[in-house]
Amino acid sequence: MTSLGLVMENSQVLPAFLLCSTLLVIKMYAVAVITGQVRLRKKAFANPEDALKRGGLQYCRSDPDVERCLRAHRNDMETIYPFLFLGFVYSFLGPNPLIAWIHFLVVLTGRVVHTVAYLGKMNPRIRSGAYVLAQFACFSMALQILWEVAHHL
C-alpha cells in the first residue's frame, strides 16, 4: 500500500478533504469551459489571432457575459486556492471528523452556490451569502491551524 493509502486508511478527514477539494477543482475547470463557450457564442475573443480565425479582428473585443465568467473564475482562484492549503493542513491536525466534514462541505456548497448565482445573474444576496459562508469555514480552519502552531512554538 502506498504511503498516501496508509494515511487515508488511518484518517477519516483526509479523504473528505480530497473529495471536496477535487470537486472544487473540477468546478473550476467547468467555469473555464463555460467561459470558452461564451466566448465562442458571443464571438468575443481575447487574442487577435483567435479573432482572425473566427471571422476578423472586429471580434477581438470584450463582452459583458465573458467578463462575468472571468470574474467568477478569478473569484474561484482567490478563494479555492487558499482552501486547498488550509484544508490540507487542517486535515493533519486531527480534527473531529464530523466537524471537518462540515467545514469542507460548507466550503464546497458555498462555492458551488456562489458560481451558480454569479453565472446565473441571480440575486446578489445569494452570491454574497454563499461567499461569506465559505469564507467563514476557511477562516475557522485558519484559526485552528494558528492555534495549533502557537501551542507548538
From Swiss-Prot:
Q: Which positions in this protein are listed as binding glutathione? A: R39, R74, N75, D76, M77, E78, H114, Y118, R127, S128, G129, A130, Y131
Side Lumenal, residues = 1-13, 92-98
Taken from the UniProt entry, a GO cellular component term is: membrane
Keywords assigned by UniProt, alphabetized: Cytoplasm, Fatty acid biosynthesis, Fatty acid metabolism, Isomerase, Lipid biosynthesis, Lipid metabolism, Membrane, Oxidoreductase, Prostaglandin biosynthesis, Prostaglandin metabolism, Transferase, Transmembrane, Transmembrane helix
List cofactor names only: glutathione
Query: Its principal location?
Result: membrane
- GO terms assigned for molecular function: glutathione binding; glutathione peroxidase activity; glutathione transferase activity; prostaglandin-D synthase activity; prostaglandin-E synthase activity
| Transmembrane portions of the chain | 14-42, 62-91, 99-120, 125-153
Which pathway or pathways does this protein act in?
Lipid metabolism; prostaglandin biosynthesis
GO biological process annotation, one example: prostaglandin metabolic process
Q: Give ranges for the Cytoplasmic compartment.
A: 43-61, 121-124
Reactions catalysed, as given in the entry: prostaglandin H2 = prostaglandin E2; 2-glyceryl-prostaglandin H2 = 2-glyceryl-prostaglandin E2; prostaglandin G2 = (15S)-15-hydroperoxy-prostaglandin E2; 1-chloro-2,4-dinitrobenzene + glutathione = 2,4-dinitrophenyl-S-glutathione + chloride + H(+)
Regulation affecting activity: Activity is increased following LPS stimulation and down-regulated by the anti-inflammatory glucocorticoid dexamethasone.
Annotated InterPro entries: MAPEG-like_dom_sf, Membr-assoc_MAPEG, MGST1-like
Topology versus the membrane, per the UniProt entry? Multi-pass membrane protein
Q: Which family does it belong to?
A: Belongs to the MAPEG family.
Protein task: Terminal enzyme of the cyclooxygenase (COX)-2-mediated prostaglandin E2 (PGE2) biosynthetic pathway. Catalyzes the glutathione-dependent oxidoreduction of prostaglandin endoperoxide H2 (PGH2) to prostaglandin E2 (PGE2) in response to inflammatory stimuli. Plays a key role in inflammation response, fever and pain. Also catalyzes the oxidoreduction of endocannabinoids into prostaglandin glycerol esters and PGG2 into 15-hydroperoxy-PGE2.
This protein is called what? Answer: Prostaglandin E synthase
The gene name reads: Ptges
